[in-house]
């Protein structure tokens, strides 16, 4: 059973981060070292994303398919990062729509199972998991490609990392779907770059109570707050998302990408370099490995299994 950190109810290129040539990231904080060296081969793992080109081939549809809630696992994060790199390497592709095949769900957040520390106390898997999330965000937030999030329902916590990293967000209206970050309700703190994306979208006055209280908004309220750019019926979600992407593609790519860089490089730079990523990892590990958070996560997972 997959579980996610979610609601309890149900030719100028963008500067890209450089992957560490050694495949390692070591972080030191309070004398601790977290290794993010991967120890497993995920090459044979099932695909969690499907990619389909538009009729004219200049943009793609990326569809997340990881029922029941499209939880952002390390496998999902890695696959999305790799897929974006592959699309960027294709000179015919100018943008993509990121959507979901799971009814009523865009993404309900982080993979809770991967936030737990094993009985042996090894924090390596947790550190590797967060590193994969960092790199996924950088890939999506800094891509030269035009991006639109097509949101058919719940977009919560880690789901907002994906949606807010896109240039435009279109969300299904009138349904049960909710949009927001609720990490604080689990005793966690959203990463600074997620909080800043909320502020960039909604403004400080509106975003502050949403993030601090972990509030989740229906589509109409998310639209009013500026967190999403448009609402649409489910039957028109794909069409409206494609239309918004085509609006971006009407601008010459080099100009659009350069302006995107101007707007986003300051926030991207907070993780663009090794020091920033390791500092962010330290912050996450300090919180996620605390006894209170681990107890609360285990209690929540146990309650889900009883349902």
State where each predicted segment sits:
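Intrinsically disordered, low-complexity segments enriched in small/flexible residues
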Residues: 2-8, 14, 22-25, 36-37, ...
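Acidic, divalent-metal-coordinating active-site segment for phosphoryl/phosphodiester hydrolysis
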Residues: 157, 214-221
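Glycine- (often His-adjacent) and acidic-residue-rich active-site loop
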Residues: 92, 100-138
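CoA-thioester-processing core
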Residues: 136, 150, 156-211, 240-244
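Conserved CoA-thioester-binding segment of acyl-CoA-metabolizing enzymes
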Residues: 2-99, 138
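C-terminal long alpha-helix characteristic of the crotonase
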Residues: 170-177, 228-275, 303-305
């Amino acid at each position: 059973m997959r579980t996610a950190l979610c609601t309890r109810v149900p030719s100028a290129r963008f500067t890209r981060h450089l992957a560490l040539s050694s495949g390692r990231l070591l972080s030191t904080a309070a004398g601790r070292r977290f290794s993010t060296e991967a120890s497993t081969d995920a090459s044979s793992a099932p695909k969690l994303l499907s990619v389909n080109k538009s009729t004219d081939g200049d943009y793609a549809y990326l569809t997340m398919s990881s029922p029941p809630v499209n939880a952002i696992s390390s496998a999902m994060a890695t696959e999305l990062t790799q897929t974006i790199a592959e699309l960027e390497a294709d000179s015919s592709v100018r943008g993509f729509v990121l959507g979901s095949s799971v009814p009523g769900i865009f993404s309900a957040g982080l993979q809770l199972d991967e936030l737990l520390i094993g009985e042996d106390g090894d924090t390596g898997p947790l550190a590797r998991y967060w590193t994969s999330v960092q790199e996924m965000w950088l890939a999506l937030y800094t891509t030269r490609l035009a991006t639109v999030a097509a949101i058919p329902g719940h977009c919560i916590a880690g789901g907002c990392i994906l949606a807010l990293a896109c240039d435009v967000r279109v969300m299904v209206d009138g349904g049960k779907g909710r949009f927001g970050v609720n990490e604080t309700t689990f005793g966690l703190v959203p990463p600074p770059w997620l909080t800043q994306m909320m502020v960039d979208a909604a403004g400080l006055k509106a975003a502050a109570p949403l993030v601090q209280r972990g509030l989740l908004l229906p589509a109409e309220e998310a639209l009013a707050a500026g967190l999403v750019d448009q609402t649409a019926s489910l039957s028109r979600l794909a069409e409206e998302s494609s239309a918004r992407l085509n609006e971006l593609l009407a601008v010459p790519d080099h100009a659009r990408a350069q302006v995107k860089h101007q707007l986003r490089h300051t926030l991207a730079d907070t993780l663009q370099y090794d020091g920033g990523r390791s500092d962010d990892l330290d912050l996450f590990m300090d919180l996620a490995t605390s006894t209170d958070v681990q107890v609360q996560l285990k209690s929540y997972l146990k309650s889900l299994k009883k349902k």
